[in-house]
A protein has these predicted regions:
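N-terminal amphipathic, basic-rich helices that act as targeting or association modules
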Residues: 1-54, 213-215
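Generic structural signal for well-ordered, non-membrane alpha-helical segments
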Residues: 2, 6, 33-41, 75-86, ...
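Structural motif
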Residues: 23-24, 55-58, 94-98, 122-124, ...
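Conserved short loop/turn motifs at secondary-structure junctions
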Residues: 27-29, 73-76, 204-209
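Long, structured ligand/cofactor-binding scaffold of large enzymes
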Residues: 33-35, 39-148
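Accessory "access/gating" subregions that flank catalytic or transport cores
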Residues: 107-116, 226-265
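Conserved small/polar residues in nucleotide/adenosyl-binding loops
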Residues: 129, 265-267
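Mobile "lid/hinge" segments at catalytic clefts and subdomain interfaces of large enzymes
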Residues: 130-131, 135-244, 249
Length: 267
């Protein structure tokens, strides 16, 4: 039976199909930051639970980081408490943290791809609605709430109901000064802010193929503004060229196997 990219990734990560039509899905990468993780770690402490797979976690200070005068530290008291909590929790559970003084620190949905933590075929979650950004690299990525952050920390799984498939094909050449941001705003205007509700959207077509990875990330990032849970795009040569030699990319054999799985053959 033919499968979409969404179908492929979902089926490969499905541990169990439940009687209520939900499924237990394995999560490959968990991105955490200071805003939605403190309560999740508190939940682990209360329930005396440990973390299932520390290596799957990428932790960074993100939402409360000042854009100027960083040498003065965090001045907002609430923001400071959240960042201190992230530091303490990462230290307690031996999770590597990309803190303010680390050159790898940055916006979570930017450094994931830049470091090669975001990889094709992965399931990726984060306590942030715009996690769909990572779908530009052929991953199934979506935001989760704090209770689910705790659940992934403890079990590496989530109980989910599968979305419906939604393909948006875009062809033609973008005019000068028209960007991917304009394109996704046009799409949202066309289908409405709830037009993608209950769907995962896959973007295809020559226009998408001609976009840079960064431009693709913009489209996937804003997919949730159309009400969809996630947006994703197929793996191609641009994806390969963007990811090659990234620090956390897996060994060549593993990656080559993934490429065969994800690549499309056009006849």
């Amino acid at each position: 039976m033919k499968q979409t990219l969404y179908d492929k990734i979902w089926n490969d990560h499905c541990i169990l199909d439940n009687d209520d039509h939900s499924s237990l899905i394995y999560i490959d990468r968990h991105l955490i930051h200071e805003v939605t993780s403190p309560q999740a770690f508190d939940g682990l402490e209360i329930k005396k639970r440990d973390i299932w797979n520390k290596k799957s976690i990428m932790a960074t200070t993100d939402h409360n980081v000042p854009t100027i005068n960083r040498d003065q530290g965090i001045t907002d008291p609430v923001s400071k408490i959240q960042i201190e909590a992230l530091r303490e929790n990462c230290k307690k559970y031996n999770i590597e943290l990309y803190d303010l003084d680390n050159l790898k620190q940055g916006i979570v949905h930017v450094i994931g791809p830049e470091l090669g933590m975001t990889q094709p075929g992965m399931t990726i979650v984060c306590g942030d609605s715009h996690t769909s950004t990572h779908g530009a690299l052929a991953s199934l990525s979506f935001g989760i709430g704090t209770s689910d952050v705790e659940h992934v920390l403890a079990t590496q799984c989530l109980n989910l109901t599968k979305d419906k498939n939604f393909n948006i094909e875009v062809n033609g050449v973008l005019h000068p000064y028209i960007t991917s941001k304009d394109l996704i705003l046009y799409i949202i205007g066309s289908i409405g802010t709830s037009g993608g509700t209950g769907y995962t959207i896959e973007y295809t077509g020559e226009t998408i193929s001609n976009l840079s990875i960064e431009s693709r990330m913009t489209i996937c990032n804003m997919t949730i503004e159309a009400g969809a849970k996630s947006g994703l795009m197929a793996f191609d040569e641009k994806t390969h060229d963007y990811l090659k030699d990234r620090e956390f990319l897996p060994s060549s054999k593993y990656y080559d196997d993934a490429l065969k799985y994800l690549s499309l053959i056009h006849i």
